[in-house]
Amino acid sequence: MEEEGKKGKKPGIVSPFKRVFLKGEKSRDKKAHEKVTERRPLHTVVLALPERVEPDRLLSDYIEKEVKYLGQLTSIPGYLNPSSRTEILHFIDKAKRSHQLPGHLTQEHDAVLSLSAYNVKLAWRDGEDIILRVPIHDIAAVSYVRDDAAHLVVLKTAQDPGISPSQSLCAESSRGLSAGSLSESAVGPVEACCLVIMATESKVAAEELCSLLSQVFQIVYTESTIDFLDRAIFDGASTPTHHLSLHSDDSSTKVDMKDSYDADASTFCFPDSGDVGGLPPLPFCMQTSPHSKTVSESELSTSATELLQDYMLTLRTKLSSQEIQQFAALLHEYRNGASIHEFCISLRQLYGDSRKFLLLGLRPFIPEKDSQHFENFLETIGVKDGRGIITDSFGRHRRALSTTSTSTINGNRTTGSPDDRSAPSEGDEWDRMISDISSDIEALGCSMDQDSA
């Protein structure tokens, strides 16, 4: 009987009733899986480099890009050179060997990167639970590294930006798996930073993401320098007899203004990422170090501040007190909605032919959306670089920003580690900062009325 029973159970033969039941169950499982993986469309734009988005889109809105989130490495030495492919891959490989970063990427690692002028936010693609949020002023550098078939985008940030130290270091630990902390025990007591590791589907997607971040850095830099210019004008026009100095207001809404200006102290590097001689491409790297502490960064920041001081002192030597007040009034009108064309024409009339070269010094303070019109205006009136120290300095300074897409890594400039101090980064803090600038200029207008009376 047992033998007959065994003979009856032939392998590969399934009862018709069981086949129908299994087919129905598989169909239900497939539909359930499709329901789970159904994803909303992203709030995004498609760029064809070197195309750029409207600055207002980043200031008042946000852009989403799909990435794969590998994880976050903490306690990385602050002296890490973000433009060095070898150094970055050293830490990534070490983390993979210790299972802190995934060796193989799956659908579970899919994430959404949300980018604005205030912060970078990462959330899981399914469920959209927030992984971390990094304020822009906590980002020291952005690098693109090609590792075989993987296209990695790495953010060098302040230690534990936007998350508590107890949170996970990588995608697996965020999903409930255990993971330790990556630390270089051989390194002495140096400031630490973090590396946020992401992957994109292609080189084009990685470069597009880096381009967007580069534009964010430039927008933040422009707003910060305009703030400095407004304060410097207010300082020089309202009290023309005392020595001009740049300062940060002591109020809570105007902190770390010098640190914000430091963003321009370092470089944005965009090396050619094509393969050379069979070697992997160098990283596509952008650096902005709002809180850097190295000597070279400090010197660069001092130099940038001195350029601004020199320009304001030049205005005081070339313009009368009344003309400086007129300049402040024109700037106030421009910041409150006047067109760049009106601003340029009015400044041209104020400066006259003999002083029109002073317009070159305004280059770093013109918002990106108006920069092309400003450059065209300079060409129209015959203003070129090379008219003295001030104009040369500002001319070189502006070109360094405008030609980032073709510059190469020099390998000698490193980024100091950002510290973990807080600074205004959310929308309300940003709005209050801009409002404070307008208030300063309005106060300048009141002092002008009193002087004329």
From Swiss-Prot:
Region spans: Disordered: 1-36, 401-432
According to the UniProt record, where is the region Harmonin homology domain?
A: 292-385
One Pfam family hit? CCM2_C
Q: Name one GO biological process term.
A: cell-cell junction organization
Q: Where in the cell is it found?
A: Cytoplasm
| Alphabetical UniProt keywords | Cytoplasm, Phosphoprotein
Start and end residues of each PID domain: 59-248
List Phosphothreonine occurrences by residue: 403, 408
UniProt cross-references to InterPro entries, sorted A to Z: CCM2_C, Malcavernin, PH-like_dom_sf, PTB/PI_dom
Annotated Basic and acidic residues bias: 22-36
SS bond partners? none
Tissue specificity here reads: Highly expressed in heart, lower expression in kidney, lung and liver (at protein level).
The primary site where this protein sits is cytoplasm
Which cellular component, as a GO term, is one annotated location? protein-containing complex
Q: What does its UniProt record remark on the domains?
A: The C-terminal region constitutes an independently folded domain that has structural similarity with the USH1C (harmonin) N-terminus, despite very low sequence similarity.
Its biological purpose is as follows: Component of the CCM signaling pathway which is a crucial regulator of heart and vessel formation and integrity. May act through the stabilization of endothelial cell junctions. May also function as a scaffold protein for MAP2K3-MAP3K3 signaling. Seems to play a major role in the modulation of MAP3K3-dependent p38 activation induced by hyperosmotic shock.
Family to which this protein belongs: Belongs to the CCM2 family.
Per its record, how is this protein called by name? Cerebral cavernous malformations protein 2 homolog
Q: Which organism is it from?
A: Mus musculus
